């Protein structure tokens, strides 16, 4: 049989059997699958609009009741109630953290796609002036309240069309993203077991509503943390020759480390090396016995070359001054990279199918990080950004700001795109 161009009709005998040509091959998905697939796209958009008030209400509830990383007990309890209220009862609460998963089983056998939302808040005192602002000293300043609401909205949509799904949808509600620990906790309790693909979305304060960015390639950088301890020998400030000044050594190391960025790194590969904390001594006229620096490395490189470069500079610089220094280097999260061609196509196609080409945003790669990438080490994944900024409404503050908020009109769109991605992935990979 000669190859059939994408989008063309299958031969008559295959068409009668319910075959569709998708992703370069014929898929049998049952009688009238093509018509049913088209109807599902319309249903998802319409259902999202129907549930818009629900999604906004849930966002406001979780915004008003934030909980810090590792303390999300009440948040999890309420999410469970919300899921059970829509008829989703196959729920697993993790034992060693406040994470939770729920399974939505489709009407036909197939693969399992996971949709993920993070649920923790930040230790920020809110100054948004919203009538539903938090009052407990912490705040959903990174948009996790919106993520919960969008995933609950997607769950409600998919629950309504579950009979048409060729596979299952696993809902992942992850704690402790803000401290880059929750994804690892969930992996240790096998939250990704049985999952074939993963999708996540982040509401973003520098992307205009109602755009949705599903760009391929680099999306968010890794997060590495380092500590440098420089040994010294204490002496009076009037007699530095009798001691060994670790602050001077630390300053030299700090300056030299920028060679990793400007002289050892391909300039086409983004790299940030920031020393954000330096401490040494407690008295204005006494040379201390130690200096300590802490900082972060952000890059899209997956290897350990930056650590090795830093270690060589730290060690050799200290030796040049006749002392020693130690580098402690922690790999907290890998980069978020949309590198699976199939998932990239499905993710973009979901936005276009629902809202047209004009709805596709373009956000450049970000040097901030997301521990979604830890879950993404297990299976192919795709990560999207939902625009939350609306200058006309005065919604202009970025994520982490004490006055941060989002254009709530975009939340139902975020829910629809998540649901559409899940439905399309399951349709394309149907058994």
Regions found by a protein language model. Name each.
Residues 62, 102, 115, 144, ...:
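Divalent metal-coordination and catalytic microenvironments
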Residues 100-101, 122-124, 128-139, 146, ...:
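Histidine/acidic-residue-rich, glycine-tolerant segments that coordinate divalent metal ions
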Residues 251-431:
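Metal-dependent amide/peptide-bond hydrolase catalytic core
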